[in-house]
Amino acid sequence: MGVTCVSQMPVAEGKSVQQTVELLTKKLEMLGAEKQGTFCVDCETYHTAASTLGSQGQAGKLMYVMHNSEYPLSCFALFENGPCLIADTNFDVLMVKLKGFFQSAKASKIETRGTRYQYCDFLVKVGTVTMGPSARGISVEVEYGPCVVASDCWSLLLEFLQSFLGSHTPGAPTVFGNRHDAVYGPADTMVQYMELFNKVRKQQQVPVAGIR
């Protein structure tokens, strides 16, 4: 894999989530991007079981268990403000056995799914973020395949993002700053999706105006 940027696209004013997704995908197709299947990234939140916290009033910690269709044999466990563990798909079964330590948060499942597009050396994924039956937002993932060091290709990624996101082009992901000259890996992409999902969850708690 190459270096990837994951961002959220605001819903266009007067449009639905699905209509905004269609506007984005049409822009990509006009650029010459070709459809290459579909993708899905999902996340379920677990919190520390009350029985493990003791009586000192400790705050429980969160763990995010995630899957990415690009890595069908892997499961990603991201600890709050901590490391990312990459395990095989049986990790989900293990979580059931660890219910005395981690418990699934109620109605915590969130996912994004949509279409993959290939444009030259760029792989683009535009997805609809859903919680339960409701569409909650739009995710945009762009991967530049030939490079594995973020600092070597961010300017190129940024230029491509600007070509179809315009004024909604994101800044450099925080994970780039932490690993400026390090080799980029799948865990870095999952951290970005975790941040995006948490942002979408928080936005559901306050009214958000549409964009022009």
From Swiss-Prot:
GO terms for molecular function: transcription coactivator activity. InterPro entries: Mediator_Med20. Pfam families: Med20. It comes from the Eukaryota. Keywords: Activator, Nucleus, Transcription, Transcription regulation. It is found in: Nucleus. GO terms for biological process: protein ubiquitination; regulation of transcription by RNA polymerase II; skeletal muscle cell differentiation. One of its GO terms (cellular component) is core mediator complex. Component of the Mediator complex, a coactivator involved in the regulated transcription of nearly all RNA polymerase II-dependent genes. Mediator functions as a bridge to convey information from gene-specific regulatory proteins to the basal RNA polymerase II transcription machinery. Mediator is recruited to promoters by direct interactions with regulatory proteins and serves as a scaffold for the assembly of a functional preinitiation complex with RNA polymerase II and the general transcription factors. Belongs to the Mediator complex subunit 20 family. This is Mediator of RNA polymerase II transcription subunit 20. It comes from Rattus norvegicus. The lineage of its organism: Eukaryota, Metazoa, Chordata, Craniata, Vertebrata.
